[in-house]
Amino acid sequence: MEKGLALPQDFRDLVHSLKIRGRYVLFLAFVVIVFIFIEKENKIISRVSDKLKQIPHFVADANSTDPALLLSENASLLSLSELDSTFSHLRSRLHNLSLQLGVEPAMESQEAGAEKPSQQAGAGTRRHVLLMATTRTGSSFVGEFFNQQGNIFYLFEPLWHIERTVFFQQRGASAAGSALVYRDVLKQLLLCDLYVLEPFISPPPEDHLTQFLFRRGSSRSLCEDPVCTPFVKKVFEKYHCRNRRCGPLNVTLAGEACRRKDHVALKAVRIRQLEFLQPLVEDPRLDLRVIQLVRDPRAVLASRIVAFAGKYENWKKWLSEGQDQLSEDEVQRLRGNCESIRLSAELGLRQPAWLRGRYMLVRYEDVARRPLQKAREMYSFAGIPLTPQVEDWIQKNTQATRDSSDVYSTQKNSSEQFEKWRFSMPFKLAQVVQAACGPTMHLFGYKLARDAASLTNRSISLLEERGTFWVT
């Protein structure tokens, strides 16, 4: 009697074994199963999410970057690029094998038609803009440059829901997996598939209606007709529209509004590495332009300590009690943040073929000093005409007589605001940032303060002039 076959050790052994014994039916079934998990974009997100929810409960710091993604420990952890490469390699092998066997991957034809509704806005002219930033860099303010334009569908931080619903470990493959989930959700949103958010909204929408979309009121497109449905008594939205009362958000109507607009723009502070956006840049259904917004890391930290006081208790304690040393974990986290930003910017400024003409680096300080000029540059880069409506908003909201006390306000006396941190930051705090983020500050043209006097001396500039160097 013939011995039972041992289970093959890798995919190649399986293919070889199946070919030898002619068991094509079993192989095709395997291919179909794998395609369901890898190729089907909408389903993979929910499946990955469910899997990751089983990881021990950990709320990720929105401002932290896992150093393991930059330098893996003992080469035992997968970096994002390695994990992404593994997925792409398996996808390619399955595609080639299925063609050899005469099987056409069904998902390709389905995805090819996914963006057809957007062609109503004008074939070949639709732009997709991603404002890539970190918290407290002025991204809400700069995002308004796109939100105020009537023909742009703008979303404010939709990835917030993913971070609050799916819990990731700080290190290793789980952190890389989070980036893949963010990317897949981001792609579907840029394609106006807003249903992709529903599994991550808590509590879940009913009949595509929700009262809990994060910062709905920060998107004009979600607060205008026909998306703004009649107000329902005793039904109150957590993040309501600012200037009018609307009923719960109808996700179907929101998606339709997105497809009617000429362009799509989205602000995200949870995108860690520029390289992971390559599949989106190369997707033929998207014409993606990435604007990376950066700010002096000293100003960022000063702002975060105020805005996220609970997360920065260790810093506040260190400052108030006069301790000599800050926790090394805190310093490492700060260094990881800066390194992540620097590596993304260096990649963008190198202009690899896939990113050429699709990346722009902008300093918040330049926007604050010359908001209208920088808005024109960003719109020119995106290939979208700037309207008088946006220009008027910029004029009115960058010359406020006094800054709002709201840390999330988008109304600023911007020419004064960008240096305000210098006069409230203790010099020893500036020293920690300068030591941890020196290479990043050098790349972006932020000068080091030599002492407490130079930090608070307004006549001493801590900013190098960089001109059009920032547009690539």
UniProtKB/Swiss-Prot annotation:
Q: In which tissues is it expressed?
A: Widely expressed. Highly expressed in spleen, lung, eye and stomach. Constitutively expressed at low level during the mid- to late-gestation period. Expressed in the brain in a temporally controlled manner: peaks at 2 weeks after birth in the cerebellum, but at 3 weeks in the cerebrum. Localizes to stromal cells in the bone marrow, and stromal cells in the marginal zone and red pulp of the spleen, but the sense probe did not.
Q: Does the keyword Cytoplasm apply?
A: no
Describe the reaction catalysed, as an equation: chondroitin beta-D-glucuronate + n 3'-phosphoadenylyl sulfate = chondroitin 6'-sulfate + n adenosine 3',5'-bisphosphate + n H(+); 3'-phosphoadenylyl sulfate + keratan = adenosine 3',5'-bisphosphate + keratan 6'-sulfate
The UniProt keyword set, sorted, is: Carbohydrate metabolism, Glycoprotein, Golgi apparatus, Membrane, Signal-anchor, Transferase, Transmembrane, Transmembrane helix
Give the location in the cell: Golgi apparatus membrane
**Membrane-spanning residues:** 20-38
Give the Cytoplasmic membrane side ranges: 1-19
Q: Which Pfam families match?
A: Sulfotransfer_1
Question: GO CC terms on record?
Answer: Golgi apparatus; Golgi membrane
GO biological process assignments: carbohydrate metabolic process; chondroitin sulfate proteoglycan biosynthetic process; T cell homeostasis
Q: Which GO terms describe its molecular function?
A: chondroitin 6-sulfotransferase activity; proteoglycan sulfotransferase activity
Query: Which annotated residues bind 3'-phosphoadenylyl sulfate?
Result: 135-141, 295-303
Report how it sits in the membrane. Answer: Single-pass type II membrane protein
Q: Which residues lie on this side of the membrane: Lumenal?
A: 39-472
**EC numbers, comma separated:** 2.8.2.17, 2.8.2.21
Is Transmembrane helix found in the keyword set?
Answer: yes
Checking InterPro entries in the record gives: Carbohydrate_sulfotransferase, Gal/GlcNAc/GalNAc_ST, P-loop_NTPase, Sulfotransferase_dom
Q: Mainly localized where?
A: Golgi
Q: Which residues are glycosylated?
A: N63, N74, N96, N250, N413, N457
Kindly give the PANTHER family that the UniProt entry links to this protein.
Answer: CARBOHYDRATE SULFOTRANSFERASE, CARBOHYDRATE SULFOTRANSFERASE 3
The UniProt function text for this chain reads: Sulfotransferase that utilizes 3'-phospho-5'-adenylyl sulfate (PAPS) as sulfonate donor to catalyze the transfer of sulfate to position 6 of the N-acetylgalactosamine (GalNAc) residue of chondroitin. Chondroitin sulfate constitutes the predominant proteoglycan present in cartilage and is distributed on the surfaces of many cells and extracellular matrices. Catalyzes with a lower efficiency the sulfation of Gal residues of keratan sulfate, another glycosaminoglycan. Can also catalyze the sulfation of the Gal residues in sialyl N-acetyllactosamine (sialyl LacNAc) oligosaccharides.
This protein's name: Carbohydrate sulfotransferase 3
Give the organism's phylogenetic lineage.
Eukaryota, Metazoa, Chordata, Craniata, Vertebrata
